[in-house]
Amino acid sequence: MPSPRIRKMSLSRALDKYLKTVSVHKKGHQQEFYRSNVIKRYPIALRNMDEITTVDIATYRDVRLAEINPRTGKPITGNTVRLELALLSSLFNIARVEWGTCRTNPVELVRKPKVSSGRDRRLTSSEERRLSRYFREKNLMLYVIFHLALETAMRQGEILALRWEHIDLRHGVAHLPETKNGHSRDVPLSRRARNFLQMMPVNLHGNVFDYTASGFKNAWRIATQRLRIEDLHFHDLRHEAISRFFELGSLNVMEIAAISGHRSMNMLKRYTHLRAWQLVSKLDARRRQTQKVAAWFVPYPAHITTIDEENGQKAHRIEIGDFDNLHVTATTKEEAVHRASEVLLRTLAIAAQKGERVPSPGALPVNDPDYIMICPLNPGSTPL
């Protein structure tokens, strides 16, 4: 019995058909749309499907892995190429069985790039302040989305899909009827999260946010470019939020998994790149309680400058950059350090009393005499 006749169809046309008839029914449709557009930029997209061989697929793989991402200036990651090959493999399987445009799947036998260990990008306190200020001034909706991500660890798609009828502000719960892993989830809303949501016009029904996935992606890209923040993805905020949950020390792994929606503990491990200084208090059980309190009152780097006052005298100004508007001025350096220590101590104590999160100490520039460490508990030990 002769083989069925192959219908000629270019890979580019097949990708378009796949997006319209198959991908459109998937949760990751938007991501597959982006990947499809990438693939169509390469010569392989002009070939008919039945002419594409394993060599062509391997060549595409190697070309992609050798390229530099123009946004980040870094090589295209193996995970990115794996996802593109997964799209092609799914396309060939559908086309082979249902469309008759090829007899084999050339992607199946090609080696896939190794899975990376995952991103461990953390949001710095400076980046958090700058983004928060930028969004607050430019767009209230972006401001709320940004802080909601840090408070809840929700994915971008979950936040953009929030509806008022699924949010219980009184009891502090946001219901997600459909998530990435196909299961519903109830997300606890902290007091800060509820306060941010209440900044939006509250309705009984409808979407909380008006952004589409592509619209928000563009807004995020513009913000990070204007603020010159490099290699920060919105999904990194989820990683940051989950890491902060671990750093609180009051939630166990199962509770954090219930909040984040992770159904695999192995997946959750990659989100736990905890800052070492916040784990010190657990190393000595005998001093655990003491160190738990002391962890709030750690030294912070500060910039010290000499300024001219209106009376013509010199003065010393100290600014602790990890906090907004935290600075002091005094006639002597010793007095300025002492005042800065007192102000820092008061700021940290108020935050501890209210249970508010404080920024982590930034890095101290190496061999820069204009930077010193301000100790809130012992100003006399602060190096001048």
Curated annotation (Swiss-Prot):
Residues 9-96 form the Core-binding (CB) domain. Residues 118-284 form the Tyr recombinase domain. It comes from the Bacteria. The keyword DNA-binding applies. Disulfide bonds: none annotated. GO terms for molecular function: DNA binding. Belongs to the 'phage' integrase family. This is Shufflon-specific DNA recombinase. The gene is rci.
